[in-house]
Curated annotation (Swiss-Prot):
Belongs to the eukaryotic ribosomal protein eS31 family. GO terms for molecular function: structural constituent of ribosome; zinc ion binding. This is Small ribosomal subunit protein eS31. Pfam families: Ribosomal_S27. Part of the 30S ribosomal subunit. Binds 1 zinc ion per subunit. Keywords: Metal-binding, Ribonucleoprotein, Ribosomal protein, Zinc, Zinc-finger. A zinc finger (C4-type) spans 21-42. Coiled coil: none annotated. GO terms for biological process: translation. The lineage of its organism: Archaea, Methanobacteriati, Thermoplasmatota, Thermoplasmata, Thermoplasmatales. Zn(2+) binds at residues 21, 24, 39, 42. One of its GO terms (cellular component) is ribosome. SUPFAM superfamilies: Zn-binding ribosomal proteins.
Length: 51
């Protein structure tokens, strides 16, 4: 996936579609899986809550 695919334009503002990794910081996005978010760079993982 290219970096430009991770942003969209809304009302003349650039909006991120994905969250940044809290460990790696801005510029490194978390991959969204069915049950978790994960960072491919550092291995950080957050599991989604089941409601």
């Amino acid at each position: 996936m290219e970096k430009r695919e991770l942003y969209e334009l809304k009302d003349n503002k650039i909006v991120r579609k994905r969250r940044f990794c809290p460990r790696c910081g801005p510029g490194v996005f978390l991959a969204e899986h069915e049950d978790r978010f994960s960072c491919g760079r550092c291995g950080y993982t957050e599991f989604k809550r089941k409601n």
